[in-house]
Every structure is written in structure tokens, then in C-alpha cells.
Amino acid sequence: MAKPGETIVNTVTGETLTFQKTASMTGGDLLEFHLQLKPGSTVPMKHRHTRQDEIFEVIRGTVNVEIGKTRHVIKPGEKILMNKGVPHRWWNSEAVTSELIVSFKPAADTEDFFVEIFGLASSGKTKPNGAPTFFQAARMCGKYNIYHPVIPVFLQKAVSLIFNLFDKR
């Protein structure tokens, strides 16, 4: 369980995340964290959340966001909403570190997802770009309700269930 003020780092993608409001603090209503993106930082794959909205508020630099097929450049003071179910991805194409506040409503167990994926990447257990391996993604998608945008969700849930039944970690 994450704690406010706790910082985690993904050494592969160049992200530094500091938890501000956690699920336990907000009764599960909200997860909020400060995110720093080094130049070239990117989420390694487009994805969608089936149970949560995600909001970015840029503090410094700019963040490129693709929601569905539409691309946006978000500047300091601007916010953007990624509605649940809509595929999205983001990246920092600038030469400076970008900073933003990221919110998930409701919180669900998303903080656990970030702790897990940052840990896997920083331990060299993901693909070189920081994306989870097929087996990691299959196990985590149903656990955290984060899905690939093209493969039917019901199929991803079934595969995730099977993988989690046999997970020997």
C-alpha cells in the first residue's frame, strides 16, 4: 500500500511518481500523484481503464496525450480528462522535464499497479521499453482493469484469470 509522500521511480521510462492522495486516504474515491517525466518519457503502450477516469494537470513543460485517435499538447495550467474505456497514451517530446498532477477516479488499486510495474521495469524484468511482457500484461490486466485497446476485454479478463490462477510469484 502506497503512502502519501512516497516516491517511486521507473528507471526505464524516466518517470518519477510521488503519491499525494491514496485510496486509503480518500475512501477509495481518488488516487492523486505528482509525476515527473524526463525528456523522451513515454507510457510504453496505448491502454484503457474500464472503471476509472484519468485526469492530467500539467504544472511544468508540456505533455503530449493521444485520446482515441486525437492528439493534444497539454501546457502548464491545462487539464485533460481521459474517460474510462477510451484508449489513451502520453509522452514528453520536450527537451525539459515535464511535471503534472495525475488523478484517477475512483482510486481502485491503481497505486499497487504503479508500484508493481515500476518495480518490474527498474529490476530489468520488462521489455526494453518498459512495457510488461505478454505474461505480465496478461496477469495484470484483469487484476488492475487496465486493458489493451484492440483485444476484446472479455478475452483479456479470461486470460488474466487463468494466468493469476497459476501465478507462482
Name every feature range the model reports, one short phrase each.
Residues 1-30, 41-52, 62, 66-169:
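Jelly-roll (double-stranded beta-helix
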